[in-house]
Amino acid sequence: EQFSADLIRDTFKVMLQMAMVLTYGAKVPVVKVGRMAGQFAKPRSAPTEVVGGMELPSYRGDIINELAFAPEARRPNPSKMLQAYTQAAATLNLLRAFSTGGYADVHQVHSWTLGFTESDQAKEYRDMARSISDALDFMTAAGLDSERAPSLQTVDFYTSHESLLLEYEEALTRLDSTSGKWLAGSGHMIWIGDRTRQPDGAHVEFCRGVQNPIGLKCGPTTTAEDLKVLMAKLNPENEAGRLTLIARFGAGKVGDHLPRLIKAVQQEGANVLWTCDAMHGNTIKSSSGYKTRPFESVLREVREFFAIHNAEGTVPGGVHFEMTGQDVTECTGGVRAVSDEDLSDRYHTACDPRLNASQSLELAFLVAEELTQRRVQTAAKTG
């Protein structure tokens, strides 16, 4: 029920809004990659869970077992992989229809964003929204409207997930008849999680053998030497666009870890794209007992990520958020000021807390401001 057509549409809609705001702020194209159509396996820190004295296998995602704490529900069920595949295929078909059928029209996307800025809580973002309106009006006056420029009605949208359940990934791997290389058919981009990035591990071995773009989560325990080995294994040809490093440290800790990893990349002359996962390092247990992520901590980590790249002379290439198009109350803060007491109202996640639609769009505006400032500073330095 969490993957109905309406919920997929709403998440896609918010991602389009975020991408438009970021494109305006950065003045460069934004590649849109959604953790959709395949994100059914969950990494867990412990193999079992104890409730009321009963110990059962941990919930590992709907592709393996069920969330309900009962022996039958927690028993791994291979048929769930077939169900996950069917769901992923249906989701991908729906995303294709949304991205090419007119739903993604740039003017419609901006009208949704204007609706967000009309609220009193979001009034600080109205100036940027109006500037985007002016830019679109100029394009129309210059003859670049949706009728005369059909590309304004469509977007390129890609899917991604953690390549965790190798039995599933291997079953969907195909030999590309054009290139003669292996291709992971479960998604456009796959990534290796912080728990499975051992250089001699099975997940690294699988990912290095496929030609898809690969993401690599880099956490506080990632050493410079391990990163060098992983870069050589995953991108031996040093190909542009092949390897994305996804930094996940937590607010207040980015400065302790990111600079040494940047230096390791520079020492190797490695061609990578740096992105910021500001979610996983900022998970806390609220006073009300719910696992949550404070909006302020997420924003702080993003700003630290940008500041360090500015100091190192490197490029911050992307942001990675766990989000939904639903009006959930799973992360605290934001323009609607979700509090600890509000979390129980609409806490729907089965695993990690997600940003809701307004929090996600607000973050996009704030990141766009960072991108604008960076662009202005760069222009000033180059004269």
Each language-model region and where it sits:
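Non-transmembrane, aqueous-exposed alpha-helical and coiled segments at domain scale
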Residues: 227-230, 234-236, 242-274, 280-330, ...
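Active-site-facing alpha/beta catalytic cores
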Residues: 3-250, 293, 301, 318-322, ...
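Catalytic cores of Mg2+-dependent Asp-rich isoprenoid enzymes
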Residues: 383
